[in-house]
């Protein structure tokens, strides 16, 4: 029993470290707390299947699309948390933060750019939120292409966006680069089209009622 307790404690510490390293905006997000409503296009059985993380081992891409406030960020982070529980390294970030991170590292000219690129390319599960909320530069388009090229068929990726893939195209500098990036993300991806009420308003009303 003591050995089992020690093993469980070690595992808990590993999970806690993975959650910390993932840099979730909401570290408490978990699939158990995902809200399923009649007017919300989110299937519990599908989320539970994704939470088993088999698709991560297959290096698949999951794309979550919804308008602002529908809870896509929570769902994405909940899936990331499920991966951490299975001892899978995760990184949560926003596309704008990736661009800023790489731009600063490139300007520093101290070798950190290559280290950061390697980290984005190699983490087992990369969660990219707010994808193409704003247009990205030619240089950042190249960065994104290099990341997705390295991950394709080797690492799993989740993309969360307010926009459909055909709208991403208009926010990437260069037609050829846009084609190359979208082909690696959108083709063959699993899609979750999340529609429903504004979840911020839903929880605000719920708190007032309580």
Where are these regions (language model features)?
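Interdomain "pre-motor" coupling segment immediately N-terminal to P-loop NTPase/helicase cores
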Residues: 1-26
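Post-Walker A helix-loop "phosphate-sensing" segment adjacent to the P-loop in P-loop NTPases
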Residues: 81-93
């Amino acid at each position: 029993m003591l050995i089992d307790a020690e093993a469980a404690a070690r595992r808990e510490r590993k999970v806690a470290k993975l959650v910390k390293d993932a840099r979730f905006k909401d570290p408490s997000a978990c699939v158990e707390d995902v809200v399923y409503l009649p007017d919300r296009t989110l299937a519990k059985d599908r989320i539970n299947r994704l939470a088993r993380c088999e698709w991560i081992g297959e290096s698949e891409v999951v794309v979550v699309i919804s308008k602002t406030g529908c809870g896509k960020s929570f769902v994405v982070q909940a899936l990331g948390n499920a991966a951490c529980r299975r001892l899978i390294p995760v990184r949560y970030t926003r596309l704008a933060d990736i661009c800023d991170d790489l731009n600063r590292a490139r300007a520093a000219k101290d070798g950190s750019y290559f280290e950061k690129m390697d980290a984005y390319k190699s983490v087992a599960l990369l969660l990219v939120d707010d994808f193409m909320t704003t247009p990205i530069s030619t240089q950042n388009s190249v960065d994104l292409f290099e990341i997705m090229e390295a991950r394709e068929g080797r690492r799993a990726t989740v993309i969360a966006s307010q926009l459909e893939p055909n709208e991403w195209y208009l926010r990437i500098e260069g037609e050829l680069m846009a084609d190359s990036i979208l082909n690696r993300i959108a083709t063959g991806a699993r899609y979750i089209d999340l529609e429903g009420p504004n979840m911020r308003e839903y929880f605000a009303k719920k708190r007032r009622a309580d």
